[in-house]
Amino acid sequence: MARKKIREYDSKRLLKEHLKRLANIDLQIRSAQVTESTDFTELTNQESWLSSTKLVVKPDMLFGKRGKSGLVALKLDLAEVADFVKARLGTEVEMEGCKAPITTFIVEPFVPHDQEYYLSIVSDRLGCTISFSECGGIEIEENWDKVKTIFLPAEKSMTLEVCAPLIATLPLEVRAKIGNFIMGAFAVFQDLDFSFMEMNPFTLVDGEPFPLDMRGELDDTAAFKNFNKWGDIEFPLPFGRVLSSTENFIHGLDEKTSASLKFTVLNPKGRIWTMVAGGGASVIYADTVGDLGYASELGNYAEYSGAPNEEEVLQYARVVIDCATTDPDGRKRALLIGGGIANFTDVAATFNGIIRALREKETRLKASRMHIYVRRGGPNYQTGLARMRALGEELGVPLEVYGPEATMTGICKRAIDCIMLPDA
């Protein structure tokens, strides 16, 4: 499971659309998204309610505690909303140690209310944890002792009986309504492959549940089966995270392929760089470098999997090698081309793209004093490793090659020993 945060606008859009389909609950929520490109006249033509009611506006940037941070404005008319957005759009703010400009807002009708409830649903490998409180809102953390929680195993179904402990202390006149809403929200959670859903708070408007503030995360590995249900969904970067040009290029490649191509720069001046096959293996290699005491020298996190074709691997490897060889300083560097033992991927085929990139970057590799360490197993691995050995001899670049007879992370220790060993 890969939990990806989505904007509040999309969380509410999905809940409203699918709660009607799955539980016959018609939420009366309305919302509009505002960015730098928004034309307020055009937006008002599309959402006529914007000009006829008092409004709430707040950043929709994947961070919480907006109310406590003075970033929520209430009871504004549309002109005041436009002024509020204009004054803050592109302005850098700091939230929990992360700094970034505000780029996206959500605008909604102002809803007067007295009671605030809290609801969250979180999934894990064994089931779902569902929490509810009659004391929701910005002080939820201070009132966490009033939150009721149940755990629903994956093999069990949600029923009113299961939900009963959460709502047992509610007044009778709202108990069934809120119970049905919790069950409906859970149905949406499961059907759309949410991994996290939180409403803090939701209230009752004319006796009907009404989410005021909402957060959501989706399991993006389920995108293939939820394309139509999710619609035009966006997975924004975490607040404060800005992609470099190289990361953005790889992200674009990843979006266009059925394979997985991931690349994150951790330390541009690091001397240990990785290009690892497999999501699990890529984490193990990074953790091993850290466990050996050299996390500060780790230049990147990189992972390719899902049998990318040779051209995709070539473009991917070019970027990794370019970053790994930038600004030579006379000290040795190491590139780990690692992986476990593949089940189906043709190792020789994927190595062809890497070999082409290494051959293209010969001058950069030598200038940066790069030492290359290869470890891989799987279908056709002997051919792939033989080609790697031949490449090392051809280029005159230090290149050590290991197969499945060697431990997967043994090359991490060899790379560290190499770059830390003083020149004779």
UniProtKB/Swiss-Prot annotation:
Keywords: Acyltransferase, ATP-binding, Cytoplasm, Lipid biosynthesis, Lipid metabolism, Nucleotide-binding, Transferase
GO terms for cellular component: cytosol; extracellular region
GO molecular function: ATP binding; ATP citrate synthase activity
Gene Ontology terms describing biological process: acetyl-CoA biosynthetic process; lipid metabolic process
Positions that bind citrate: 343, 345, 376
Entries under Gene3D superfamilies matching the protein: 3.30.470.110, Succinyl-CoA synthetase domains (3.40.50.261)
EC number(s) from the headed UniProt entry: 2.3.3.8
Catalytic reaction list: oxaloacetate + acetyl-CoA + ADP + phosphate = citrate + ATP + CoA
Localization of this protein: Cytoplasm, Cytosol
Subunit structure: Heterooctamer of 4 alpha and 4 beta chains.
Protein family per UniProt: Belongs to the succinate/malate CoA ligase beta subunit family.
Job of this protein: ATP citrate-lyase is the primary enzyme responsible for the synthesis of cytosolic acetyl-CoA, used for the elongation of fatty acids and biosynthesis of isoprenoids, flavonoids and malonated derivatives. May supply substrate to the cytosolic acetyl-CoA carboxylase, which generates the malonyl-CoA used for the synthesis of a multitude of compounds, including very long chain fatty acids and flavonoids. Required for normal growth and development and elongation of C18 fatty acids to C20 to C24 fatty acids in seeds.
UniProt protein name: ATP-citrate synthase alpha chain protein 3
Species in which this protein is naturally found: Arabidopsis thaliana (Mouse-ear cress)
